Structure formats: C-alpha cells, structure tokens
Amino acid sequence: MITYTKMFEKVGTLPFETQHYIEKIDWDTVQKTDTQRVSEHKTIRAELLDDSFGRNIKYFCEQDLNLKLYQANISMIPPGSLTPMHTNKFEYITKKYNLIIEKEQYDNVFIKYWIPLADKTIGHWFEYNGVLIGDWKAMDIYRLWGSSTFEHCGGNLGLEKRIRLEIIGSQLSANKIHQIFT
C-alpha cells in the first residue's frame, strides 16, 4: 500500500560512535544472509557481534529503545544497487524468537528504526510510503511506522557505498507475544 503520507519521523541520533567500526569492515568477506532480498547487498547481524560495537547495539536496543527482543542489521548497499519496493515480512525475527503472528498484527508488535551510518551523498535515496527521506546525516535515527503495510525502496546510484543500521524489535517480550497470539 502506498498513501504518499509521511510515515517516518527523525527521533534522535545514535548515542555511540560508528565510523571507526564501519571503516574496518571488509565487506568482501561478509556473507549473504538467509533473508536478504538483493544478492549484492551485504548484511551483518550486529546484535550477534561479540565486540564493543555489538555491546553498544545491545545496550542501545535494550536500554534506550526499551526493546525486549530485536534484530539489528548493518547493511552495505554498493554503487549501482537497488532495493526493490517491498514491505517487511519480519522473517528473521519471528524465526529467531519462534513467534507465530498473523501479518495483520506485525505493525502492532514490531517497531522499525532506520539509521544511516554515512551522510547522504549524490545518488543515495530511501523512499518510504512514497515519501523521500531527504538530507540524512550519519547516525540520524528514523522511526518508520507500518513497515509491514507501507511499501518502501531505496538505492545507490552514486559512487560511494550506502551503509545503514536497521533495528527491528518489540517492546513486548517473546512470552507476552506468545500469550497474546496463541
């Protein structure tokens, strides 16, 4: 569904530094994930990292965002690459926590945050529900509403890698979700 209504809001700035970590990533060694739609994109499951960056993600998700369950993906979109129009299916997080939820309930359970890890540059874009997120800066935090309902897409037709952090989670525990939906 596309309504051309702004369904996102800038809600803050990531409270820890990312540049030193991102610069060290050897994207050629990063494997494709099981739920990745576009083969050229590279994704790191940040919540699984056993280092200071992973600990910062864990603290941010649990303390600052008050998420009881979550996934956090660092994705690199190379030049010349597009993310086709889609809605979120929440395959990884529902599988990870063994959640059985009807698609119609996803937006009542899950929250999505989109956080660019590099400033917007020529050729980079992200469109959500037909509305562009404009002049983003590295570490801006955008909350996206209804990501299983509203279509979104993005791309990189520029010269530099486009790198983002996406956090999907719930402020309900897995047990509470099981109680509600079983």
Predicted features and spans:
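Catalytic core of non-heme Fe(II) oxygenases with the double-stranded beta-helix
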Residues: 65-145
